A protein has these predicted regions:
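Flexible, acidic glycine-rich loops studded with aromatic residues
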Residues: 258-363
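Active-site beta->alpha loop and helix N-cap motifs at the rims of alpha/beta catalytic domains
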Residues: 48-148
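N- or domain-start disorder-to-order transition segments that initiate the globular core
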Residues: 1-30
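Conserved, mostly hydrophobic/aromatic
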Residues: 45, 106, 137, 152, ...
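Active-site beta-loop-alpha junctions enriched in small/polar residues
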Residues: 18-22, 47, 107-113, 140-144, ...
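Catalytic alpha/beta core domains of metabolic enzymes, predominantly
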Residues: 157-296
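Structural preference for beta-strand elements that scaffold enzyme active sites
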Residues: 12-16, 40-43, 101-105, 134-138, ...
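Active-site-adjacent beta->alpha loops and helix N-cap segments on the catalytic face
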Residues: 24, 115-121, 139-153, 166-180
């Protein structure tokens, strides 16, 4: 373990890798990151699978076994195999942490982002297909996704809620989570191993807000560049602490073994070269947090990160940042609404590419 990744972990942050591929599993790379860089979980998304499945070679043997199946079936077989194999690698960590960590996430078809019924249906299908207790099903935090989150948790299925950008939506996600756990309890499920994280996206907020600040051009605007995303995430953590401390339903559920839905910082790779490549890790360290990071960010953290606690005592400053943005005419809700819509659209585009790449693979191995 490196000093920085160990310190980050010791201060309450579970380090998950935001990447997965057949070659990463078969090469031993994933096991190496577990052994040497404190990695205790994995997240995937359509863009990650697009990158993985575009590789010619690693998936050919399985494609040959599948034969001339339809492309949707092939994609699900390939992706769930990777996730299943990864969950097996993490099983020891899952058991050692009482299934808090050792989790591997797989996302529902992004084309269902605004379809509650079919999102909930596919969540069950994916859970049963992977068939591992340390898997997590990713569901987007669209308005239509919220009831699907509750319905999925109510069946005892672990959920990673993704594409959260705003405090307003995050509060709705926490409410959907608590309601889902309450229903799971009423349905007779053991609450101890139902896991959930709320994936709150970080760096994309700075990318969007900084453009507006640059367009403003004032000294006040310049002083706020690179501050919106961390302030927004820190206020999400404030909300996390407040909601779980004050919601009367949660105390009863926790007494029955339910585990808190941890905030997960996503989109933590630095997009602006002027900022530290550890910015969205080092500035967001506290207890009961997950940070999922691309390997480049993980390597930066391991090499020169800090990992010291960095959220406590920052709420007043963070509220001030958001207020100053509003004074400059920047409505953060407008920004985050667009980021959610853009995020769904980007994942759909990636999924379409996945389907095209796998169809090419099917045609190639069956030629």
């Amino acid at each position: 373990m490196t000093e920085a990744t160990q310190r980050t972990s010791d201060n309450g942050v579970s380090i998950w890798l935001d990447d997965l591929s057949r070659s990463r599993i078969e090469s031993g790379s994933l096991q190496d990151l577990i052994a040497n860089k404190n990695v205790v979980g994995v997240t995937t998304n359509p863009s990650i699978f697009q990158k993985a499945l575009s590789q010619v070679g690693p998936y050919d043997a399985q494609l040959k076994e599948l034969g001339k199946v339809d492309v949707e079936t092939a994609v699900r077989e390939l992706t769930t195999t990777d996730v299943r194999n990864a969950t097996d690698i993490f099983r020891e960590i899952a058991e050692a942490t009482d299934f808090v960590d050792g989790r591997v996430s797989i996302e529902v078809d992004p084309r269902l982002a605004h379809d509650t019924e079919n999102t909930a249906k596919q969540a069950v299908e994916l859970w049963e297909k992977v068939n591992r207790p340390n898997a997590m099903i990713k569901i987007p935090a669209t308005l239509e996704g919220l009831p699907a989150i509750t319905a999925t948790l109510a069946k005892g299925i672990s959920v990673n809620v993704t594409l959260i950008f705003s405090l307003e939506r995050y509060e709705q996600v926490i409410d959907a989570f608590i309601e889902g756990i309450a229903q799971a309890d009423a349905n007779g499920h053991d609450l101890k191993h139902i896991g959930s994280v709320a994936s709150f996206f970080v760096s994309r907020v700075d990318t969007a807000v900084d453009k507006l600040l640059e367009a403003n051009g004032s000294d006040e605007a310049k002083a706020l560049e690179g501050k919106a995303a961390v302030a927004n995430a820190r206020l999400a953590y404030e909300l996390f602490e407040k909601k779980f401390a004050e919601d009367p339903r949660w105390a009863d559920l926790a007494a029955k073994g339910a585990k808190v839905q941890r905030p997960l910082w996503a989109s933590t790779g630095t997009k602006n070269a002027a900022y530290s490549d550890c910015k969205y890790v080092d500035e967001l360290v506290d207890k009961h947090i997950v940070n999922t990071m691309p390997e480049k960010t993980l390597n930066a953290l391991a090499d020169h990160g800090n990992g010291a606690p960095s959220i406590e005592g920052t709420y007043e400053e963070s509220h001030a940042v958001i207020s100053k943005l509003a004074e400059l005419g920047i409505n953060l809700k407008d920004v985050t609404d667009k980021l959610e819509a853009d995020g769904v659209a980007a994942f759909i585009k990636s999924w379409d590419s996945v389907l095209a790449d796998v169809q090419s693979g099917i045609d190639r191995v069956n030629a």
